[in-house]
Amino acid sequence: KKYKLVILSNGTHALIKELVDTNNLIGIFDDVISVEEVKIYKPHSNVYNIPIKKYQIEKKQFAYLSANTWDVSAAGNFGFNAVWVNRNKNIFDNLDYKPIIEIKNLIDLNNLL
C-alpha cells in the first residue's frame, strides 16, 4: 500500500469511531486525527498542518478529500491537492479555490489510485 488513508475531523474521537463503525469502514484508515485535543477547528489553517507535522511530508504530497466545499477550499488554499467528494451532484460554492478533481464517491478514489 503506497498511500496512507487518514481521517482529519472536527469531530470527537467517539463520533468518528461511531461513523467508521456504522459505515463499515473499520480497518480502512491508517490513522484518525481529531482536533478534539488541540481545540482548533477547520477551516483554521493550523488544523491542516497537523498531518503535515505528524507525517513529515510536503503539502503537495497530500491529497485532501472532503464532501464540504468550504473544507476543500480551505485545504486547497493551505496547499493541499484538494479533492471534492460530490455525492449529490451539487454545484461547488463560489469560493476562492476550486478542487483539483471532483469524484462521486470513495470508489472513484480507489479507481484513481
What are these regions (language model features)?
Residues 1-2:
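Catalytic-core regions built around general acid/base machinery
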Residues 8-13, 17-113:
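Asp-based, Mg2+/Mn2+-dependent phosphohydrolase catalytic module
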